[in-house]
From Swiss-Prot:
Provides the (R)-glutamate required for cell wall biosynthesis. It comes from the Bacteria. It catalyses: L-glutamate = D-glutamate. The keyword Isomerase applies. One of its GO terms (biological process) is cell wall organization. Keywords: Cell shape, Cell wall biogenesis/degradation, Isomerase, Peptidoglycan synthesis. This is Glutamate racemase. Its EC number is 5.1.1.3. The active site is at 75 (proton donor/acceptor), 176 (proton donor/acceptor). Substrate binds at residues 12-13, 44-45, 76-77, 177-178.
Length: 257
């Protein structure tokens, strides 16, 4: 029997998953979270899917050893590479971010997708929604990880990637949890296009599932503990620039995974 007071594990290649974490905390204020950022190996998007799959299994195994009651794969690349196997084989509920974002796009006639190279090439999104256009944007994650989401260079890069988007595009799936931090630049290039991310819908799915399984924490304090594979203080500085209050962060060596 899983313990309702156990934490929820959330992981991403870096800080992108903080968008999902924030949505989870809004809906589940009593839950405790372990947020794992694989900052020593970010970005995932240019790596082979088999390698990303191995990373996802390593992190999921580590989180299980910390006693989590559920795992949220808050990374589109890792969700594309590993979610079906993780969900089938792990002993706790596992949630990804691909299907929720695809569901949000179904009300639009002409939908585009931007994501990492691995996510776009995986074919994960076309399983759930018809796409009129898709584009890999490999520089977007490094821009966010370097703290440049509101720098003029972000707008230049967005123009470079998005200039060939169809003129009649109605909605664009932000197929990477880092990309919501670039909504300003993306929206400036594609005014009038609905920008869809999976954070809120993923959080709603997690909340429904935990309630159905009797796993909601009735009396938690809503704390978040941060774990990173890279420099903890660099992570803290970047996360706090993104609005995340980091009270506790610990480095996890790759040998611990």
């Amino acid at each position: 029997m899983k313990d309702p007071k156990a934490p929820i594990g959330v992981f991403d290649s870096g800080v992108g998953g903080l968008t999902v974490l924030k949505a989870l905390r809004r809906l589940l204020p009593r839950e405790e979270f372990l947020y794992f950022g694989d900052t020593a190996r970010v970005p995932y998007g240019g790596k082979p899917l088999a390698m990303v799959r191995r990373f996802a299994w390593e992190i999921a195994g580590f989180l299980l050893r910390q006693g989590v009651k559920a795992i949220v794969v808050a990374c589109n690349t890792a969700s594309s590479a590993a979610l079906p196997d993780l969900a089938e084989d792990l002993s706790v509920p596992v949630f990804g971010v691909v299907e929720p974002a695809a569901r949000a796009a179904r009300g639009f006639r002409k939908v585009g997708l931007i994501g990492t190279q691995a996510t776009v090439e995986s074919g994960a999104y076309p399983r759930y929604v018809d796409l009129a256009w898709a584009k890999a944007c490999p520089l977007f994650v490094p821009l966010v990880e370097e703290g440049l989401w509101d720098d003029p260079v972000a707008l230049l890069v967005a123009r470079h990637y998005l200039e060939d988007a169809p003129k009649d595009l109605e909605a664009l799936i932000l197929g990477c949890t880092h990309y919501p931090f670039l909504k300003g630049a993306i929206g400036a290039v594609l005014p009038g296009v609905a920008l869809l991310d999976s954070a809120e819908l993923t959080a709603q799915e997690v909340a429904r599932a935990l309630e159905a399984e009797g796993l909601l924490n009735p009396e938690g304090r809503g704390r978040t503990f941060h774990l990173v594979t890279g420099d903890p203080e660099a992570y803290r500085a970047l996360a706090e620039r993104l609005g995340e209050r980091v009270e506790a962060v610990r480095r996890v060596s790759l040998e611990e995974l």
